[in-house]
Amino acid sequence: MKSYEVNFDGLVGPTHNYGGLSYGNVASQSNSQQGSNPREAARQGLAKMKALADMGFKQGVLAPQERPDVAALRRLGFSGSDAEVIQRAAADAMPLLVASCSASSMWVANAATVSPSADTADGRVHFTAANLNCKYHRSIEHPTTSRVLGAMFNNEKHFAHHPALPAVAQFGDEGAANHTRFCSAYGEAGVEFFVYGRSAFDSRYPAPQKYPARQTLEASQAVARLHGLSDDGVVYAQQNPAVIDQGVFHNDVISVGNGEVLFYHEDAFLETDAVLGQLRAKLASKGGNFQAICVPRAAVTVEDAVRSYLFNSQLLSRDDGSMLLVVPEECRNNERVWAYLGQLTSQGGPVNEVKIFDLKQSMQNGGGPACLRLRVALKETELAAVNQGVIMTASLYDTLLQWVDRHYRDRLGEADLADPQLLVECRTALDELTQILKLGSVYPFQRQP
């Protein structure tokens, strides 16, 4: 049976703004308080989805969340009508309103961790929504994320959904941004690679000193248990604390893997040789031939990697065995990174083409091509069981472009977040979107009695 990797990209929401909310994320911090363009941001994301679909890659779309999150503000003590809640939050606690308006759910690499059916004990595709408890503005996402994923993958025969892990620091879980999978074919058993920043319960593990390590070993282990993964199909690795302190807040900022290939920076991991040895041996036991492409620090510094988002790229496998690397425009603008990519594609290795996308609106908030997508490996029968309303087609692309142009503002600043009309605009847009994508009532405002 045929099998595919399907990339489900996050659709940028109507409240996309530069709130500077993500400590440890260099771009998010440095672009704080700039004016944003939600319409352009959504269009840039859709353009990438359409281009990859046109190239023959399986592509889907993941809906944004209702923002501002009025219910979250009510839990923090603001009362009155929805408009009054927003106005009172703006007057008394603007940072809380900014957080409640974040469109960060666009970075769906953090939405969940996904294990394909070939790896799991019960032969179903497993999803665990990420609790994202390190940052308040992201910690409020997972209830809606779970409902949206449930509406997309709504077939108990093929799909199993788990709620987020306990929302405490010991089980900090950032989803697929710290997870990748190696395999000889998407429908065959593979090796799942979990990368963590610290251990919550074992002080022998080192930890970063400046920025927080958002993923714990214990969270990764819990997800592997929930998904019914076998020990011979899992490798755990600790991310180098020194690179976390340089702005590598998720592993997908310093490495990317797909198929049998890991593309990584020399400084990405602790005990790199041992990690690569485990990956090589475990993949070999499943009939795969692991290939590691190391980018030396002499060619690309960690600072260059963070500024260009070289590793926050999409590594895509073609049917002929060659690979395409999808990178942001910022890679071409970095002389050392661009020189390295020229060498990479001319060496005769698996990566023989680089494709550039303008994702500036997302990049300025610290999210590149890899942040914007959630990968789901599916067999043909499983793909047929997915809600077909979320699969990207030329028709859906045109419909979504028109939807964006109708509902999204072309400029948004902090002061605009206090406008109650923005909530009305967002709910109107999302109500229409659920009909376009055939999701049903997944948003809180649609579920109120």
UniProtKB/Swiss-Prot annotation:
Q: What class of enzyme is it?
A: hydrolase
Catalysed reaction per UniProt? N(2)-succinyl-L-arginine + 2 H2O + 2 H(+) = N(2)-succinyl-L-ornithine + 2 NH4(+) + CO2
State the EC number(s): 3.5.3.23
Q: Name one GO biological process term.
A: arginine catabolic process to glutamate
Q: Where is the active site?
A: E174, H250, C371
Pathway named in the protein's UniProt entry: Amino-acid degradation; L-arginine degradation via AST pathway; L-glutamate and succinate from L-arginine: step 2/5
Q: What UniProt keywords are attached to this protein's entry?
A: Arginine metabolism, Hydrolase
Q: How does it assemble?
A: Homodimer.
- Family per similarity comment: Belongs to the succinylarginine dihydrolase family.
What name does this protein carry? N-succinylarginine dihydrolase
The top of its lineage is: Bacteria, Pseudomonadati, Pseudomonadota, Gammaproteobacteria, Pseudomonadales
Name of the encoding gene: astB
